Amino acid sequence: MNQTDTTPAGTGSDGDDRAWRDVLARLTVPAPADLLDRVAARWSYVEGPVEDVFVAFTPEGIASVAPASSVDDDAEFTEAFRQYFGRPVLPASGAPDGVEEALRTGDATGLRFDLRGRTPFECDVLQATLTIPPGELRPYAWVAWQIDRPRAVRAVGSALGHNPVPLLIPCHRVIRSDGTVGDYGFGSPMKRRLLGAEGVDLDRVEATVRRGWVVVGDDRSGLVCMPTCHRSEGVPADHRHTFRTVGEAAGQGYTPCPDCRPMGG
């Protein structure tokens, strides 16, 4: 009995699309009309905060993001996607709704992500990281505390190192406890560029953290915040009070900020 060869010929963006459609056309039993979209992911090239980026997505959500400088061309991006996710990725006419705005504003909390293949721990880490606003920083320990795994700081770093959707899930906003930027999948210079584009003064952050991570209280609002929280940035000196811990601040009548959720709050 002869067996139909279902290996698609041809490479490249348009070639891949035609090749897979040819495979479906040769199937003995007619394929569902939407089978190609269910099997293959799609990719688009969009403007990013510091350079253009490749974005791959499925019906479930955004699956992969990569700065243009991290690959030679779209063929390298699509091949890397195929090897990592085990499925083809074909060109799309555009990115899903909301992606370009999320890259422009730095807020991707309204997007859906396809995180299949990530462990529950990794998904928890990514979900906590997604809540960090643009222009603000958190230490790895903060992420660990947010997911109720305060001792898993190194594991948090490893999970962020495997973030398939950087820039949108902003692992570049997570830094070391000493105030230095730390590692980044696309290199620390790219991490600095991204933070600089968000208005982060890394020299000031490092100088602040060298004195020890403190929380900042505002005696007008009664809130205590992380030092990089947007609420603490503009507190006048005569209303600004620093504490070593949230517990110490609570003893003075302060309430943890609902936005930055300082550790121990």
Spans of model-derived segments:
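Structural signal for hydrophobic
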Residues: 129, 171-172, 194
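Short Lys/Arg-enriched helix C-cap and helix-to-coil transition segments
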Residues: 167-175
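Basic nucleic-acid-binding alpha-helical/helix-turn surface characteristic of O6-alkylguanine DNA
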Residues: 1-151, 197-265
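A boundary/linker detector
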Residues: 177-178, 188, 194, 250
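Regulatory, non-catalytic segments
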Residues: 153-166
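Aromatic, loop-rich ligand-recognition surfaces of beta-strand-rich domains
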Residues: 182
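A short, Lys/Arg-enriched interface patch at domain edges and termini
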Residues: 186-202
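Primarily hydrophobic membrane-targeting regions of prokaryotic envelope proteins
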Residues: 137, 159-160, 169-170
